[in-house]
């Protein structure tokens, strides 16, 4: 069939015996790129190109013959997947070139870990073990030697590790920014000293025990209660001494000092006794060395509060808090602007801010690989408040169980813990801790309270 080499779309030519307009002539500039070189140059144009012109029979014949020659090219086949040589180490299927050779994922990871961790392996045979995909895990020494023999590069692993270090650099900079400034260090040391001077560590105490009701829970053991109430009174006095040593505490109004002490005293007492918990023996030790087991603590007056306190003590163990952290957490519990009835809550908040910052920096500096330890410690304050609320209720029920009256300092500091007055339905009483006119701090001190009775049981 004759052809003049024209290039036309298949829509041109005859359709059911009727001529069909050839649209290639309307848009020659659009189709020129699809035509072979010179294919349109030799085509005569017998009529002027017009939107309404009809091609001549000769032109139709030319279009018909040329349209039969256009065959759409088949789609190009997809590229063949890249095929790597088997793993040079174990002959398993390779996943690509790793550290200089074709290797499988298993050998790649083994080599990387071995180099990064400076692993030293031992062969239990003659150092000629066969390494293939079945035996590769049997001898790490020979597998590593095979990696070196086939050309795996230590430097490639180190370079890869350096790239990751650069990517992680911003995180490292954030960690390194927690440096202890002289101001923070001074605050930490003052709080640590205040804590240590008012609360000796467990290792400094000569522990002793008692056989009183050590095996069976009872509602109240009077002898244990007498001892417990005496020790509790001394602990309250030490808590007040601790507060007076905290920077800025005595600059607060007398009313706010008393409000904060009464609201947080039980929090601090519970936190302190829980740091003297011995998990192996399930005992707690008081400041004079008296060591009580769980049953004895219950019978001494803790009652239904006992298991809550011991559970909290167990939760503190993973934190491994030192004296500075315990002191700072106690100070944060005490100096807290959200307590009820404060005259200057904003001033209290400002005093608390450096304590929070000091604890955060100290904890993160001491545990650089445990960034979540600081928020975990702060969450313990919520737990302490929950236990303290139940402890304040326990003081009320104890008044009905003990013979005689409650020791005045325990009743004053613990029964009137925050929120308890609304629970009892009674208005707050005037505090016996109120200092004389002109005093700059609460009048409560060891010298002024040692003469007060510590037990009123018969």
UniProtKB/Swiss-Prot annotation:
A zinc finger (NR C4-type) spans 87-107, 123-147. One of its GO terms (molecular function) is RNA polymerase II cis-regulatory region sequence-specific DNA binding. It is found in: Nucleus. PROSITE patterns: NR_LBD, NUCLEAR_REC_DBD_1, NUCLEAR_REC_DBD_2. Pfam families: Hormone_recep, zf-C4. Its main location: nucleus. SUPFAM superfamilies: Glucocorticoid receptor-like (DNA-binding domain), Nuclear receptor ligand-binding domain. Residues 153-182 are annotated as: Hinge. Residues 87-152 bind DNA. A motif (9aaTAD) lies at residues 408-416. Expressed in forelimb, in the distal forelimb blastema, kidney, liver and hindlimb blastemal mesenchymal cells. Receptor for retinoic acid. Retinoic acid receptors bind as heterodimers to their target response elements in response to their ligands, all-trans or 9-cis retinoic acid, and regulate gene expression in various biological processes. The rar/rxr heterodimers bind to the retinoic acid response elements (RARE) composed of tandem 5'-AGGTCA-3' sites known as DR1-DR5. Retinoic acid signaling appears to be involved in specifying proximal-distal axis in limb regeneration. Composed of three domains: a modulating N-terminal domain, a DNA-binding domain and a C-terminal ligand-binding domain. This is Retinoic acid receptor alpha. It comes from Notophthalmus viridescens (Eastern newt).
């Amino acid at each position: 069939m004759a052809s003049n080499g024209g290039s036309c779309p298949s829509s041109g030519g005859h359709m059911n015996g009727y001529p069909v307009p050839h649209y290639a002539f309307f848009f020659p500039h659009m189709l020129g790129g699809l035509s072979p070189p010179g294919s349109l140059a030799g085509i005569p144009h017998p009529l002027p190109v017009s939107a309404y012109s009809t091609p001549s029979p000769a032109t139709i014949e030319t279009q018909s013959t040329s349209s039969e020659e256009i065959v759409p090219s088949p789609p190009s086949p997809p590229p063949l997947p890249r095929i790597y040589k088997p793993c040079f180490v174990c002959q398993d299927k390779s996943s690509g070139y790793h550290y200089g050779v074709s290797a499988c994922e298993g050998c790649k990871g083994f080599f990387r870990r071995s180099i990064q961790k400076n692993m030293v392996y031992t062969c239990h045979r003659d150092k000629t073990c066969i390494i293939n995909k079945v035996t590769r895990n049997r001898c790490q020494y020979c597998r590593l030697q095979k990696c070196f023999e086939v050309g795996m590069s230590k430097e490639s692993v180190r370079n890869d590790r350096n790239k990751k270090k650069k990517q992680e650099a911003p995180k490292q900079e954030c960690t390194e920014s927690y440096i202890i400034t002289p101001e923070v260090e001074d605050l930490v040391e003052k709080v640590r000293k205040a804590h240590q001077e008012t609360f000796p560590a467990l290792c400094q105490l000569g522990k002793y025990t008692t056989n009183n009701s050590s095996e069976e829970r009872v509602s109240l053991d009077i002898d244990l209660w007498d001892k417990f109430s005496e020790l509790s009174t001394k602990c309250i006095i030490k808590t007040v001494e601790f507060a007076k040593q905290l920077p800025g505490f005595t600059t607060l109004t007398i009313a706010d000092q008393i409000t904060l002490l009464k609201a947080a005293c039980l929090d601090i007492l519970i936190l302190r006794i829980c740091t003297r918990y011995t998990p192996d023996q399930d005992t707690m030790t008081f400041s004079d060395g008296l060591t009580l087991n769980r049953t004895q603590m219950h019978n001494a007056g803790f009652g239904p509060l006992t298991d809550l306190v011991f559970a909290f003590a167990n939760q503190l163990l993973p934190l491994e808090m030192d004296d500075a952290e315990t002191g700072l957490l106690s100070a944060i519990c005490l100096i807290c602007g959200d307590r009820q009835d404060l005259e200057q809550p904003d001033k209290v908040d400002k005093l608390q801010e450096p304590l929070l910052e000091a604890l955060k920096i100290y904890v993160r500096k001491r545990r650089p690989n445990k960034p979540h330890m600081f928020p975990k410690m702060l969450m313990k304050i919520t737990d302490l408040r929950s236990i303290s609320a139940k402890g304040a209720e326990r003081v009320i029920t104890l008044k009905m169980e003990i013979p005689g009256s409650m020791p005045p300092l325990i009743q004053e500091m613990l029964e009137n813990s925050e929120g308890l007055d609304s629970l009892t339905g009674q208005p707050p009483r005037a505090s016996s801790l109120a200092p004389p006119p002109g005093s700059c701090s609460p009048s409560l001190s060891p010298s002024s309270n040692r003469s007060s009775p510590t037990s009123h049981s018969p």
